[in-house]
């Protein structure tokens, strides 16, 4: 198997990232996302680093995984949580260490930043495979449930 590399996403990745967002939303939540909206939203992150950053995992020059990191300020900790979001691993690359490499990269970068106090993510309550993966990587369920009012997707 070819070597896996992790890099920051750039403007040339927008279409691929957005396409993978749509595939992930359809697979995990049965939601068909609007292509133009996902392209605009993805481009917004690439153009404005204060929103977050994408990491891309490549093998043999092909994108096999990706995730988004966004930021949440914690006044309790006087620090920033990095949130892992929009995780996608190509179906043929699953169970080959792609997510682990992305995760380890995020945690390593987060630990190197003085103002980062932790890494969080949310996972669908029925996605037991992902929950096992996250637990195996040292993550544990938090004390919180997520509540929302979604003005776009309902």
Regions found by a protein language model. Name each.
Residues 84-94:
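A short, internal acetyl-CoA/4′-phosphopantetheine-binding micro-motif in the GNAT/acyltransferase core
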Residues 9, 87-89, 123:
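Hydrophobic adenine-recognition pocket in adenosine-nucleotide-binding enzymes
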Residues 1-15, 154:
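Conserved N-terminal entry element of GNAT/NAT acetyltransferase domains
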Residues 100, 125-143:
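Conserved active-site alpha-helix within GNAT-family acetyltransferase domains
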Residues 112, 136, 145-154:
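Terminal substrate-recognition subdomain of acyl/acetyltransferases
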Residues 111-122:
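Conserved GNAT acetyl-CoA-binding A-motif
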Residues 93, 97-105:
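Conserved acetyl-CoA pyrophosphate-binding loop and the N-cap/start of the following alpha-helix
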Residues 8-11, 19-80, 85, 103, ...:
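Acetyl-CoA-dependent GNAT
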């Amino acid at each position: 198997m070819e070597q896996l590399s992790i890099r920051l996403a750039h403007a040339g990745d927008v279409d691929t990232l957005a396409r993978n967002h749509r595939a992930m939303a359809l697979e995990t939540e049965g939601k068909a996302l609007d292509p133009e909206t996902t392209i605009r939203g993805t481009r917004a992150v690439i153009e404005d680093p204060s929103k977050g950053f994408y990491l891309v995992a490549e093998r043999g020059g092909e994108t096999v995984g990706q995730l988004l990191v966004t930021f949440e300020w914690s006044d309790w900790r006087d620090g920033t949580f990095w949130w892992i979001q929009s995780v996608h691993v190509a179906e043929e690359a699953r169970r080959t260490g792609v997510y682990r490499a992305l995760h380890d990269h995020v945690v390593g970068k987060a630990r190197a930043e003085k103002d980062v106090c932790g890494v969080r993510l949310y996972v669908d309550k029925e996605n037991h495979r992902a929950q096992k993966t996250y637990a195996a990587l040292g993550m544990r369920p938090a004390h919180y449930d997520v509540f929302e009012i979604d003005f776009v997707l309902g």
